[in-house]
Amino acid sequence: MRRRKAPVREVLPDPIYGNKVITKFINSLMYDGKKSTATTIMYGALEAIDKKGGEKKGIDIFNDAIENIKPLLEVKSRRVGGATYQVPVEVRPARQQALAIRWIISFARKRSERTMIDKLAAELLDAANSKGASFKKKEDTYKMAEANKAFAHYRW
């Protein structure tokens, strides 16, 4: 374990929307340091949402999607006297955002649309409308936490 807490690095806001969450999303989307490709995919998806989304802008739908997918509870394994319990714990805000971004990207990659831009746009629209695989993942996490409510007193 490290001696001190790692300093939180400052993330610069993205150049088009001036939004730090979009920068984090682009960084998570990136493979092998190819940031320009990830940026093209992200902005392409937001433009595609602008065309499909009706009266709402792409950036608003993106923000709604992130908010809808953020989990408030999750379960962590805790070993007590030879038995392992799934203990429900609250999720810190930074981790909520990180999990939401991670889930949206991973489920967008598994979709069947042709290009990654289309996959990401469709997943963001689904997430904003409280449906889709990433929303189901959040619901499943809640169900796990609810089912293991009895072990909440093992929190640390």
From Swiss-Prot:
Does the record's keyword annotation contain Repressor? no
InterPro entries per record: Ribosomal_uS7, Ribosomal_uS7_bac/org-type, Ribosomal_uS7_CS, Ribosomal_uS7_dom, Ribosomal_uS7_dom_sf
- A Pfam family that the UniProt record links to this protein: Ribosomal_S7
What are its GO cellular component terms? small ribosomal subunit
Q: Molecular function (GO) terms listed?
A: rRNA binding; structural constituent of ribosome; tRNA binding
Which biological processes are named by the entry's GO terms? translation
The cysteines covalently paired via disulfide bonds are none
Could you tell me the keywords of this UniProt record? Answer: Ribonucleoprotein, Ribosomal protein, RNA-binding, rRNA-binding, tRNA-binding
Extract the SUPFAM superfamilies matched here. Ribosomal protein S7 (SSF47973)
Q: How does it assemble?
A: Part of the 30S ribosomal subunit. Contacts proteins S9 and S11.
What functional role does this protein have? One of the primary rRNA binding proteins, it binds directly to 16S rRNA where it nucleates assembly of the head domain of the 30S subunit. Is located at the subunit interface close to the decoding center, probably blocks exit of the E-site tRNA.
Instruction: Return the similarity comment.
Output: Belongs to the universal ribosomal protein uS7 family.
State the name under which the record lists this protein. Small ribosomal subunit protein uS7
